[in-house]
Regions:
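Pepsin-like aspartyl protease folds
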Residues: 529-569, 580, 597-613
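Alpha-helical protein-protein interaction modules
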Residues: 217, 221, 225, 238, ...
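Helix-start (N-cap) detector for alpha-helical repeat units in TPR-like alpha-solenoids
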Residues: 25-27, 60-61, 94-100, 133-134, ...
Length: 613
């Protein structure tokens, strides 16, 4: 919601609200407030509009914009208060602004999860401006989320009657048909959308969903690729991964064909990497990601390579690519989080703790950071420190069952039985969804219900053995069934589990640690792993640091550097006699909007006088 106030405004009101009618306000503060909104400056707009309502408390128009601004800032209470005043004070004859006020309040009520009031407000807005198609679309969305497809379709058909060339009516009816698995009806709607707007990616991505429903994967892949080629459609990206599960060879090969068609485009090899990584074909994914990275030095691609190497157990390469991601975008703390995890997987827990400290300094409210640091501290022998971090995680993420389990295990080790049992009860209370059980089997065993624990782990293995073999090895080791534990550990290693440092210090496996079968098994797969890692000789260096010479010309005390932005022949001019290197607000705004600067690049702002004053 925070990206652009002006976009939010356009989504809520007709362009006719901008028209200057004789009976609409034209006071100084009101006018400046509207200009600030158009320039996407929320703080300045609030300042002027608050002054306006102090001077003119009956200006309902100002309240309507204040409601919009508070909505943009996610200050829903103040947004609702302002919207309530706006609906009362805007002249009833000014239908456009009456509609705007109700539509804004409807959006606020949706954010407050009061769909009944939101529905009433959208209906009031429609009564004021019955030809505004966006209002029907917004109300139809509420019906859709309530599975009231007939009522939603009525609003979508109204959109079509108002504007036959607007794709949203047909898209809505098609989406509703998909939700009801009426695939052929949906396809007919999306076919027409594509005829109306052949470059509208959603027509293809939603039709792909219909084809997947009919198991016509060949057509689905074609539509996904078309949608991705238009604008990198998010739904198409999600469906591509779904197709990787249902029709991997077909999806992978068609992406390869697209790569051959557009050899200079970085996205296609990236997508190949995604589908291969999803299928745990990590080396193929790495090769594809590297191809993409060679065309576009993107931190996300380097991050994905790091993840693949981490899953392969090649921690040196994983760290190298994670460092590359950090060097390309030091503002994304997810890369720091991942680096800490890789360090811990490599057995370097103390370094992992230091790295996670950096992450938590930047994200002090992120519960997952405390959970992982607690995990690292446990591995390094700091039980009390681990309990402290798990407790902080529980404070921030009280529904996360694993935190209670790990803390309960540590309390149990310390002999604090009552506290341990309380935590195990919390695990069972939270980890209850049958198809999504994560750790309740451990809690049941610790609480004395072995049969329930075995039943749960067997169900998990039946559903997805590869993801649960290691858990089974841990559970059976805890229960003292050594042969079963070693057998499941073998299955985990055979299906790609390579976290040897974790295996060697996981206390759950202590009961099999001295067994010959365990020792032989680890020796066998560590040797196999060394061969796997050495076979990838291309990774001695993941990236190379170079120094480039930038030509410039000097004119007096000024230096000019030639550059081009969006094809425009420009110069950056630096005054070498100045203590500050600065950009004007116009230049900075231009560069932010075009992706050359982010908010974190701006240190501050300052007013300067030119020589002319």
């Amino acid at each position: 919601m925070r990206s652009n106030i002006f976009v939010l405004l356009l989504a809520l009101c007709s362009t006719s609200v901008w028209a200057q009618k004789s009976n609409r306000p034209d006071s100084y503060n009101y006018t400046r407030g509207i200009e600030a909104i158009q320039n996407n400056n929320a703080d300045e707009a609030l300042e002027y509009l608050n002054k306006e309502i102090q001077e003119h408390p009956d200006n309902g128009y100002a309240y309507s914009y204040l409601s919009l601004l508070r909505l943009y800032r996610e200050e829903y209470g103040q947004a609702l208060t302002a919207a309530n005043v706006a609906t009362k004070k805007i002249p009833s004859k000014d239908k456009e602004y009456v509609s705007f006020a109700y539509a804004t309040r409807a959006k606020v009520n949706l954010c407050l999860e009061d769909t009944l009031k939101a529905f009433k407000d959208y209906t009031a807005a429609i009564n004021a401006t019955p030809d505004d198609t966006r209002l029907y679309e917004a109300r139809a969305q509420i019906y859709y989320e309530q599975s009231k497809y007939d009522l939603a379709n009525a609003d979508y058909r109204k959109i079509i009657s108002l504007d036959e060339g607007d794709v949203m009516g047909y898209m809505g009816i098609g989406r509703n048909a998909n939700a009801q698995k009426r695939w052929d009806e949906a396809i007919s709607q999306f076919d027409y959308v594509i005829k109306l707007a052949s470059e509208y990616s959603s027509g293809y991505s939603f039709r792909a969903e219909s084809y997947i429903g009919k198991k016509q994967y060949d057509k689905a892949v074609d539509d996904v690729i078309t949608a991705l080629s238009i604008d990198g459609d998010n739904k198409a990206f999600y469906l591509m991964q779904q197709l990787a599960d249902s029709a991997f060879v077909l999806t992978n090969n068609k992406l390869k064909v697209q790569t051959a068609k557009e050899p200079n485009e970085s996205s296609w090899p990236y997508f190949i990497g995604v589908v291969n990584e999803r299928q745990n074909k990590y080396q193929y994914a790495i090769d594809a990601y590297k191809n993409s990275l060679s065309k576009d030095n993107n931190p996300i691609t380097a991050y994905r390579i790091a993840n693949c190497y981490d899953d392969l157990g090649n921690y040196e390469s994983a760290l190298a690519y994670c460092e590359q991601a950090i060097s390309l975008d030091s503002t994304d703390t997810d890369y720091i989080f991942q680096k800490a995890n890789i360090l811990n997987n490599a057995g370097r827990s103390k370094e992992a703790i230091e790295c996670m400290n950096i992450y938590l300094e930047k994200n002090p409210e992120e519960g997952s950071g405390y959970y992982r640091r607690g995990w690292f501290k446990d591995h390094s022998g700091d039980i009390d420190g681990a309990i402290e971090d798990y407790t902080m995680c529980i404070t921030l993420m009280p529904e996360y069952a694993y935190c209670y389990l790990n803390r309960g295990v540590l309390y149990r080790l310390k002999g604090e039985t009552k506290l341990a049992e309380e935590d195990f009860h919390q695990v069972i209370e939270r980890d209850t969804i049958a198809d999504e059980i994560e750790c309740a089997h451990y809690a049941y065993y610790y609480m004395g219900n072995k049969d329930k624990a075995v039943s749960l782990i067997n169900n998990l293995i039946e559903k997805d053995g590869k993801s649960n073999y290691y858990d089974a090895a841990c559970l059976y080791s805890i229960m003292g069934e050594k042969e079963k534990s070693i057998g499941y550990l073998r299955k985990a290693l055979e299906t790609g589990f390579r976290r040897f440092a974790h295996i060697k210090r996981d206390r759950d496996l202590n009961n099999i640690r001295n067994e010959k079968g365990y020792t032989d098994l680890l020796n066998e797969f560590e040797e196999k792993h060394r061969q796997e890692v050495s076979s990838d000789s291309s990774d001695s260096e993941s990236f190379e640091e170079t120094t480039e010479e930038i030509p410039f010309s000097k004119e007096g005390d000024m230096c000019k550097v030639k550059c081009a932005i969006n094809g425009l022949p420009l110069h950056f001019i630096f005054d070498t006699g100045s203590s500050n290197v600065s950009l004007s607000s116009v230049e900075a705004t231009f560069m932010v909007k075009n992706g050359y600067l982010s908010a974190s690049d701006v240190v501050g702002k300052q007013h300067f006088l030119t020589a002319s004053g």
